[in-house]
């Protein structure tokens, strides 16, 4: 690591909690002030409380933490702060907790912080500093607490805020509406309310929000709270709640994607018809297994037509799925892609498939190879005449012999069309299309899976650094060369591979290692391997 330039070392330190980054100042004279150059600060007193609570009393632990944060912020001088993260748990008898936290927050804001993440657990009702709501630099804001009540000032203005995450934050009704109005650039809003929370914002109104996630985990007073979704620009909606008597009015003009996770309560008056009507223009819809049950039991009116729905992800873990799926196929005349999961949970007894369905691609998730699953797939490939592709994702773990047998069973199924293509696939939920820089420090993983699954899922990856403790040992592991060869073979666009050997390795071993590395098979003749 000493061979790396200061700029890269500072970037690496920025990924660490500030406590760990500060400890590197003991390594050498060069490292003494490197941590102060990091634009990211991450403080967490819960780790300190857990590690020292048997040796020190709580008051001394908290005093030590306060002194550490104050001294670290003082070292910033006039340098800017990009990200400030604070996890703070107030201890009994701490009378200055709120004062200390508010001082640190204001200090970060004065240094032009653009990302502010607060997770605060007070023992009493407290308020956040009003300066949070008048920052012109904030781009991301996360507020997580159980007892903070924001006081929104009249001069509220957050012109740069794009991402807002609220967990158990309680606003007065008009205050939250004023809050959103003061965020003209807001694109991503997440609201999470726990059972102990007092309530939710009544109205969510914004013309700029593109991604909206609302989760309400309290089954009591379910009709208290949300009254309006006035978010016409939303392209991705996640809504998790208990079934209600009356749902908020939804202004979602052209919703491309939505996920519904509605949970059942033993309430005969509950009704989800209004909710379904509010998202009837959606193009891609995911219904969880609990939502499937709720729709069947709590839809008092006629289910609206989903004229624009093209992609449907449907969970069949409840017995009632076979009654709802045919109905959905009828009310979704333009549905072309159907994804089903949990089909091994219930016996297949057959159901009616609408003759006019237009489903062209069917995906079966978590396939176990059971008799009931095979019968269901057989029914689909016979009755769905428009089917072109059936993708069956086998459940993991599963040995190669069983996968081969499942594949043979599926390919033998009679089909409505000879052109139908059945594919048996191993699932991968990993996809990071925008990832450019990746640094791993002592992370243990399956190298074969990492090379075959992870790297193909990162098409934009440009800078990859890996630090594995075994590489630093004097006695080299037998598997190291095998691991490195995976990188040199699987990363086709790799241009430079630098191997930093242990400082204790003598010159003879370095020469031997260099020869072995240069013999490794590579995916490109342009790849340069350097031993540092």
UniProtKB/Swiss-Prot annotation:
Coiled-coil ranges per UniProt: none
Protein name listed in UniProt: Putative F-box/LRR-repeat protein At3g42770
Sorted UniProt keywords: Leucine-rich repeat, Repeat
Domain F-box as annotated: residue spans: 1-46
Molecular function via GO: ubiquitin protein ligase activity
Example of a GO biological process term: cellular response to phosphate starvation
First and last residues of every LRR repeat: 113-135, 279-305, 398-420
InterPro entries assigned to the protein according to its UniProt record, in alphabetical order: F-box-like_dom_sf, F-box_AtFBL13-like, F-box_dom, FBD, FBL60-like, LRR_FXL15/At3g58940/PEG3-like, LRR_PRU1-like
Repeat in keyword set: yes
């Amino acid at each position: 690591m000493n061979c790396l330039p200061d700029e890269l070392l500072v970037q690496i330190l920025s990924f660490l909690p500030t406590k760990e980054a500060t400890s590197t100042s003991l390594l050498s004279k060069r490292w003494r002030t490197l941590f102060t150059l990091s634009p990211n600060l991450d403080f967490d007193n819960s780790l300190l409380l857990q590690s020292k609570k048997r040796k020190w009393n709580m008051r001394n632990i908290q005093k030590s933490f306060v002194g550490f944060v104050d001294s670290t912020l003082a070292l910033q001088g006039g340098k800017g702060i990009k990200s400030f993260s604070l996890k703070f748990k107030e201890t009994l008898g701490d009378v200055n907790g709120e004062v200390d936290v508010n001082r640190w927050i204001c200090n970060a804001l004065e240094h032009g912080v653009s990302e502010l993440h607060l997770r605060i657990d007070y023992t009493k009702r407290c308020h956040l500093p009003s300066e949070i709501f008048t920052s012109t630099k904030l781009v991301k804001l996360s507020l997580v607490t159980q007892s903070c009540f924001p006081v929104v000032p009249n001069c509220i203005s957050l012109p740069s805020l794009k991402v807002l995450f609220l967990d158990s934050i309680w606003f007065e009704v008009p205050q939250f509406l004023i809050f959103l109005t003061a965020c003209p650039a807001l694109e991503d809003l997440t609201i999470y309310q726990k059972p102990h929370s007092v309530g939710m914002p009544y109205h969510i109104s914004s013309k700029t929000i593109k991604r909206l996630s609302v989760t309400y985990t309290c089954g009591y007073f379910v009709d208290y709270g949300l009254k309006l979704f006035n978010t016409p620009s939303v392209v991705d909606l996640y809504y998790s709640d208990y079934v209600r008597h009356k749902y908020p009015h939804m202004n979602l003009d052209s919703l491309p994607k939505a996920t519904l996770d509605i949970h059942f309560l033993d309430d005969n008056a509950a009704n989800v018809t209004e909710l379904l009507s509010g998202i009837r223009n959606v193009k891609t819809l995911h219904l969880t297994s609990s939502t499937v049950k709720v729709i069947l039991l709590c839809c008092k009116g006629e289910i609206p037509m989903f004229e624009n729905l093209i992609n449907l992800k449907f969970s069949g873990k409840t017995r009632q799925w076979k009654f709802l799926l045919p109905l959905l196929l009828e009310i979704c005349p333009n549905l072309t892609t159907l994804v089903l999961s949990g089909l091994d949970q219930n016996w297949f007894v057959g159901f009616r498939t609408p003759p006019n369905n237009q489903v062209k691609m069917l995906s079966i998730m978590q396939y176990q190879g059971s008799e009931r699953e095979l019968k269901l797939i057989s029914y689909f490939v016979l009755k769905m005449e428009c089917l072109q592709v059936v993708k069956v994702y086998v459940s993991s773990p599963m040995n190669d012999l069983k996968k081969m047998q499942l594949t043979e069973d599926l390919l033998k199924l009679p089909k409505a069309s000879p052109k139908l293509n059945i594919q048996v696939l191993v699932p991968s939920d990993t996809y990071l299309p925008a990832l450019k820089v990746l640094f791993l420090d002592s992370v243990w993983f399956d190298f074969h899976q990492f090379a075959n699954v992870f790297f193909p899922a990162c098409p934009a990856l440009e800078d990859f650094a890996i630090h594995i403790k075994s590489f630093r040992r004097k006695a080299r592991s037998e598997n190291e060369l095998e691991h490195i060869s995976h990188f040199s073979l699987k990363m086709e666009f790799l241009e430079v591979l630098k191997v930093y050997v242990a400082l204790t390795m003598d010159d003879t071993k370095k020469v031997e290692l260099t020869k072995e590395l240069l013999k490794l098979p590579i995916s490109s003749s342009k790849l340069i391997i350097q031993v540092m």
